[in-house]
Amino acid sequence: MLPRMLKMKTVGTVLAVIWLFGLAFIYVQSTSSSLRPPGRHPPPLPQLDPLIPQNPPQNDEIRPKKSAPPIPTINLAEDTTIHERTEKDVTWKTFDVEKFLNKGKWHQGEDKYKANSFNQEASDALNPTRKIPDSREPQCRDVDYSKVGMQPTTVIITYHNEARSSLLRTVFSVFNQSPEELLLEIVLVDDNSQDVEIGKELAQIQRITVLRNNQREGLIRSRVKGAQVARAPVLTFLDSHIECNQKWLEPLLARIAENPKAVVAPIIDVINVDNFNYVGASADLRGGFDWTLVFRWEFMNEQLRKERHAHPTAPIRSPTMAGGLFAISKEWFNELGTYDLDMEVWGGENLEMSFRVWQCGGSLEIMPCSRVGHVFRKKHPYTFPGGSGNVFQKNTRRAAEVWMDEYKAIYLKNVPSARFVNFGDITDRLAIRDRLQCKSFKWYLENVYPQLEIPRKTPGKSFQMKIGNLCLDSMARKESEAPGLFGCHGTGGNQEWVFDQLTKTFKNAISQLCLDFSSNTENKTVTMVKCENLRPDTMVVEKNGWLTQGGKCLTVNQGSGGDWLIYGAHCELNNGAQRWIFEKLDTYE
C-alpha cells in the first residue's frame, strides 16, 4: 500500500512542476512584446503622404480600425435599363446632329420657358460646338500639367426631361474640351424622362453609356448608379445644362493626382437663362451656407482674397460645394459612403457631402483654372415626388442628425417644421462616421469655416408650456399685452419660452418679452413686459408643474365667453389649472 502511495505522490509532483512551467511560458509569451532586448526596435511605420490629411490618434491612444460597412449600392438589374449600341462606327463628330435636334425643337407659338425654365428658342439656335470666351485668369494659361501623372475620368451626367439642344451641347463640350487620353467615357443616366428616345440615340455614340431609370429616382440615386458602372479611377459629376471651357479637366485631375482625398470643383461661370450668353464668374467666390442649411455663394474676406491673388492658380479651400459639378477619386467616393441613398431626389446632398469630406479627412477645393458654364434656372421645371419643401427638409434633417452634433439645434430653431420630418434610419450613415473616425462639427466650424457666424447660445432652458392640448403662446403680441393659449405645434417660435435661472425671468424666445403676473392684485391678467422692468423672482417648479412669481402661480381658466384667462393666483397643490407640463425644446446650449 505504501509504495503505491509514494508512486502517486511522485506523479502528482511531476504534474505540478509541468503546470508551473506552462504558466511561466504563457506569461513570458504575453509580455515579450513589451520586453524587447536593448537595441531591438519595432519595424518602421509606413511613410504617410504629406498631401493627404491624416487623422492622428488623440490623447496618445491608438484606436482600432473599424470594419467597413458595405458601400451603398443599387441593384441595377431590378430597375435600370442599359441602352444597346446598335451602330458601331458613330463618334461624336459623325453623329447626325440635325436629325437628333429636330425631334425636340421648340416651335413657334409655344412657351419658350415652360418645358425647361430657360429660353429653349435661344438654346436651340446655338451650335452644339459653339465657341465660348476663355474666362480663365491669364496665369492659368501658363500652367503645365504634362508632368503630372493624371488618371482618366468617367464623366457622369444625369438628366430628367432635359432639352435635346442643351443636353447635346453639354455632351459635345465634354468631348471637345477634354484630352482624349483623360476622358475614358461619358455615362448618361436618364432619370425616367418622358422622351426615352433621347437616351437610345445618344447611346450610339462611342464612349457613351446610357442608363435609364425605369422609375423616377432623383439625382442622388442616379449618380450612384452612374458611379457603379463607371470604369475610370476618377469620377466627374456634371449637370445636364453646362458647357466646359478650355482645359477645364486637367486642373481637376492634376489636383486629385496630388491629393487623392481632395474633392475638386471648377469655378462655375454663368450661362444666361434668357439669351444663353456666357459670362465669367468671379474667382473670389466660395461655397458657404446659412443655418437653414441652404447653400450660398459668398465672397471671400479681405485676408482670403489677398492670399488667393498672391497665388491665383492655387486651389481655393471651400467650406461647401454647390454639388452639381465636381470630381472625386472613385476609391475615395466609395470609402466615404458614396451618397446617402435615403435622401430623396435633390437638395441638401451637397452640404451633407461637404461636411462628410471635411470631417472625415478630405478637403473640398475650387480649382481656379478650371471653368465650366452652367445655366442657373430660377425655378425647377420638374416636380419633386412628395413636394420640394418636404424633400429638402428630410434631406437636410438627415445631414444635421449625422454630422452637426449639438449644432443641429441651431438648424432646428431656424427651420422648426423640420422637427416633425420623418428622416428615416441613419444607422448606416453614423456607422460611416464612426468607421472613418471623423471629426466633430465643432472642429469643422473652427478649422474650415470660422467665418460663419454662430448664434449666441441661449441663456437658460427652453420650454414649451402645455396644459392639456394647449400651449402658452405669445400670439405675436406686443409689450403690455397678454399672451394666449393655442394648439401645441412643437415648432417653438411664439410657443418657445426661456427660463433664465441667473436672472430668474421667463421670456418668449421670439419677442424677448417676459411674463409679469407678480401684481398684488389677485387674479390680475398676466402681461408681457421688458425683462429689465421686472423684479427677478420667477421660478419653475417642475415637480408641481408650477410657474411662480411674487408668491403666485400662473393659472388658467375659461371665461364665460369661452376665452381663456391667464393670470396669477394663490398656489394650490391640487389645482389642475396651475399644473403645467414643461416640455424641453432642443436648443443650442
Swiss-Prot record:
Gene3D superfamilies named among the record's database cross-references: 2.80.10.50, Spore Coat Polysaccharide Biosynthesis Protein SpsA, Chain A
Species of provenance: Caenorhabditis elegans
Pathway in which the depicted protein is active: Protein modification; protein glycosylation
Protein name (database record): Polypeptide N-acetylgalactosaminyltransferase 4
Keyword Glycosyltransferase applies: yes
Taxonomic classification: Eukaryota, Metazoa, Ecdysozoa, Nematoda, Chromadorea
Amino acids binding substrate: 191, 216, 240, 346, 377, 380, 382
Cofactors demanded by this protein: Mn(2+)
Pfam families per the UniProt record, alphabetical: Glycos_transf_2 (PF00535), Ricin_B_lectin (PF00652)
Localization per record: Golgi apparatus membrane
Transmembrane segments: 12-31
SUPFAM superfamilies: Nucleotide-diphospho-sugar transferases, Ricin B-like lectins
Binding site for Mn(2+): 239, 241, 374
Membrane topology listed for this record: Single-pass type II membrane protein
